[in-house]
Each structure stands twice: as structure tokens, then as C-alpha cells.
Amino acid sequence: MESGNSFLVFCGTDTMYLAKEICDYLNCPLGNMNVTHFADGEFAVSYEESIRGADVFLVQSTFPPSDNLMELLLMIDAAKRASAKSVNAVIPYFGWARQDRKDKPRVSIGAKLVADMLSTAGVDRVITMDLHADQIQGFFNVPVDHLYASMVFMPYIQSLKLDELVMAAPDVGGSKRASAYAKYLNVPLVLCQKTRTRANVVDEIRIIGDVQDKNVVIVDDIVDTAGTICKAGDVMKEAGAKSVRAIASHCVMSGDAPVRVDNSSLEEIVFTNSIPYRNNIPCKKLKQLSIAQMFAETIRRVIKNESISSQYVIK
């Protein structure tokens, strides 16, 4: 697909690996943009080619959150001031998505604040994947194309050819996601009920459903410390599961998460490449699948004003 000057693709500092893949599928060059860093930690962005009258697509996941979000905001602002026809933020991983509501008094709703900041900067459209909560789409006053990692996970699961397959949710909050996989594959669903006394620390997990002699695939969206998903895997293995593996959209994997995964009962943990693996500790059980083709096809459909709904395997 030749771009001419009708559309241009640029990327932030930490998402170049994915943007290059997307451009390969679109058969277009990656745009030339410069990020200048100053001694005090401040930075500025500038486009090194004309973007006047072009549909501009900015590929940038917001992880690590603060710098990458600020870089994206500056990219959007610069594109608007350079007379781009439209500015489309392609955000495979949307940071702050776990702050989607007031779950206790006197807290902010970070996801809504970030949505407001992007809108104020001048974004015309957001393309993202597997938001932590679907309702975040409603925080924006511009169109949001919400993609699903099932496009890459479903073929992978089917390629494993597992008998006695069971899909599992690591907590009640993830039951809708896991249920969609179970329904599509026509297999049973298992739920985990967890108690957590403080953030990132899981005290106890109880299994709701039968995993005896089953091959279990746990479905999640974000794996941060990996405490929940590893404990769920261990509990299921103790309950007689034949094998336990996990799929998750976003590979945050903070702190000792790699050690926790490698020491757990999980056979493997499979992510998309919405964000790069940044932990200095290697993880032998980790695998990443590319979402570049899915995002490239979505960009193509946006440019051509074609329907995007066929991009959804399951929701």
C-alpha cells in the first residue's frame, strides 16, 4: 500500500520496533521524527518532513507511562500545529487503564484524565487494544477503535491442539474476557476468586470449576508482578490440572515477575508485543506474538473508510 502523502506513520522512542513492522505490512516508510532531550530531563519533538494535509498515524504505547505519554502528547500537538489533516493515536497499550473508576474515596480517575489530555492535545482518533475496562472508550470525545488480542491468540491456542481444554479467568473481573474465549472455542470456563489485602499482593485463590485432568489456558489483559496469574497456575496444578499456561495482552512484567513465572507451575506465558519486554531479568517461559499485521490492517481500513468490525475475532 503506497502512502504518497495521503497518510504518514510516525512513532515514539520506545515503539519503533512495532511501528517498523506496521510500515512493512503497509508498504510505506516510517516517517522521520526527531526527539531532542535536554539536560534537565525535558524533551521536544519535531517532524523532519512535511505532514501538511496528511492523515498522520502516531504509534506509541504508554509504557513506561509518564515519559511515553508526554512524548505522545507533544507528537499530537506538533502534528496539529503542522497542519496535518487528521491525527490518529495508535496506542497498543493504554497506560493508566487500571484507574478507570473511583474504587475508594479521594482518588483520581487516571484513565479519564489521560483521555482528556489526549483530546486537549488535538487527537482525532484513538486506535488501541484490550483496554483494562471497555468503558474507557466512553472517556474520549473522539472515535475509539478498540481492537482485541484474540486476533493473534486464538490461532495460537488452536495450533496447540490441546485436548480437554479449559479457559480460565484469574479473577472475577476477567471473567467476561475468558468467557468470550470459552464460548468461541466451545469449551468450559473456570473462574478464580481471589482475596487481596493490598495492591500487587494476592493472599488466597479459590477455583470455581473443574480442572482435574484438564489443559488450562488462563486469559488476562495485563501481567504486572505476575503474582495473581502464577498463584492461579499453582492452585490449578495442585487441583489436578494436566497443564496450565497463560495468555495476556500486555507484557508489563515488573520487578521479580520473570523469576516468579519461571518458578511457577505455568508451562508458558504468551504476550503480544504491544510493549517490549523491558525487564533486565530473563524469563525462559515467556513468548511474544506480533500484533503488527492487525494494527496495519486497521490503519489501512481507517484510511479507506472501511469497516473495522471484521478485525474482531471475539470481544
Language-model features: locations:
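PRPP-associated nucleotide enzymes
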Residues: M1-K315
